[in-house]
Structure formats: C-alpha cells, structure tokens
Amino acid sequence: MKNLMDFCLGTVSFMILGSSLLLGSSDWALGGFIGKPSWDLFLHFENYDWSSFVFNLVFCATAATIVSGAMAERTKFSAYCVYSAIISLLIYPIEAHWIWNPGGWLVKLGFHDFAGSCAIHMVGGISALIGAALLGPRIGKFNKDENGKVVKVHTFPGHNLPLGALGVFILWFGWYGFNGAAATSVEQLGSIFLTTTIAPALATVSCMIFTWLKYGKPDVSMCLNASLAGLVAITAPCDTVDAFGAAIIGIVAGLLVVFGVWLCDHALHVDDPVGAVAVHGVNGIWGTIAVGLFSTTTVPGNDTLNGLFYGGGIHPLLIQLLGFAAVAAWTAVTITIVFLIIKKTMGLRVSEEEEIKGLDPTEHGLPTAYADFLTTK
C-alpha cells in the first residue's frame, strides 16, 4: 500500500507543482536553484513535453519509495502519505532541477549524475536515515543496560527471503531501463547495459566472499542487498566508465553495503529493517564520487569527462563532492523539518500496542496480509 501510494500520491504532487519546479525555466529567479512554477501541463497540454513528465515522475516516485523500508513496521500510514507527497512535491524536484535541468546550477558547474545515484538514491537514503532515527527502533531491536547503552543488537529475519530475491531480480532487470532510457545512441546504450551488468555482479561476488570469510557462511540477504548496491553505485557513472571502472565500483559497493548495515546497527543504533541506508544512501554517495574517479572519454558518448584516475585531474572529483554535499545538505534540512512537523502534529509512530499487533489489522483493517496463514474454525 505504501509503495502504491508513493507513485499515486507522487503523481498528484508532481502534477501540481513538482514537475514545473524540476523542468521549468531557471531564468526567472535564484540563478538555477529552482524551476519556474507553472500550470503548463493543464494550460498548454498540446505543446507539453509529455514523455519528459512521465520519465521524471518515475524517478521522483523512486526517491520517495526508498524511505518506506527503513521505517517499516512502526510508521503511521497517514504520516507516511504526508511525507511521501512532500518529497515528490518539493524536496526531490528542486535538487533534481540542479542536476538535470539545463539551467541548474550544478549542471553549469559540470556535475554529472546520469541516472540518479545522487539525485534519487542518495536523497532517498538520507531521508530514510533521518526518518528511521527520528522514528526510533522497532520494539526489541536493541537491548540496553541500566545506563542506556546498547549492549546487544537483535536481527529480525524477513518473512519471505525467496520473495525478496525475486524482487531483486525484477529490480535488476528494470535497472536496464532505468539507466539506459536516456542513452542517445545504440553504442552508448550497449555500453550502459554492460556497466549496469558488471557492477552489481562484482558487488554481489565481493559481498559473498567477505561475508563468507567473516561469518563462515555467505549471507544471502546481504548478497541480495549487494546486488542492489552495485546497481545504485553504477547509476551515476554508467555512461562514463569502462568495464574496469565498473568492476571496481561494484567491488567497493559490495563491501560498503556490509559496512553500511554495521554502521546503522552498531554505531548509529538506527533500525533500518531492509538496509535502505546502506544500499541507497552509502552507495548513492559512492556512485556520485566514482564519476570523478573512473570516468573516461574512451566510453561511447562521453567526449569530455575524464576522472582523476584517467588523467582528468582533481577538478571533476571536487565538482562531484560539491554536488553531493549540496544535495545532501538540502535533503537533510528539508526532510528533518518535514518529519519534525509531522511528529509534533499528527505523529510519526503507531502505538506500542499497534506495533505488537501488527499494522495490517490496525492500519488497514486486514487480519493479515497473508491469507494462506489464516485458519477457520
């Protein structure tokens, strides 16, 4: 239901204001900071860029839906609807305007994010981290001593690992469209497909080897997240890196996802049930930075951008770092304000009784989401 509303409420928000803030002219005010609000979708439909609206809407909804996993099992549905709509209305469109609108200030500086490691995944990951931190952990996640120090972290296994694996396979397949949709030639599309295959594959292998060595067994759920981490990391540089660059990006992503999960659980004590922060936040940052390291003009369609390791100097890396910092700051400030307002007014979290009983009956009036487990007398 939450993922459904991400897209449906996101469509409403993007239609009302978000699309014009992203796609509108930058010349009207603030020098590339925000697009000019307009109702061209309704007033000048015959001349509107319909395909661009749909293309950017899907990206917008993706940023919003990342947050749900980190706040699972204890968030009010009403609160979820509010912040999801605001992400699509204001938070995502403005920073995406900086990155993808020809008049955006980051575009003018030379910042590069082909398909959204920064604009989509990092934004979703940062929002997820802040939301989960303000919401608090699920009941029983952390054991604390008399001084309030966390002494034990409990793992709650997912209810259906094969279904989760199927989701990863579907996402991986869909990512070829996600990354390849903006290709301008067949050669560039082929190169993007190749890097989009190499990075998640190497990420999964590196994660498997690492968890095998560390825990004595390869961690299935961590490897599934590593596949997604590799996809997230390659999303920004998929059109500017070669096979070697994609391989290194993937290997690092597979290790970073393990580190990100550890960071949330044992250092920050933030309860992220699905690893959204590690997958999207940490590897969104890594993918953004990787553009400034591994880009090469030997790749079809990339005639100008060389990274630090390919003779381009430090300037491209500094631009990527600036862009990451600006978008991260914008996202952190705005989503924190949104969450705090919701928390002080309608409330973010369900009651302890509702959480223990489960959100299916308390939020949606369902005995359970899994009818096969119902028994009749």
What are these regions (language model features)?
Residues M1-K377:
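Glycine- and aromatic-enriched membrane alpha-helices
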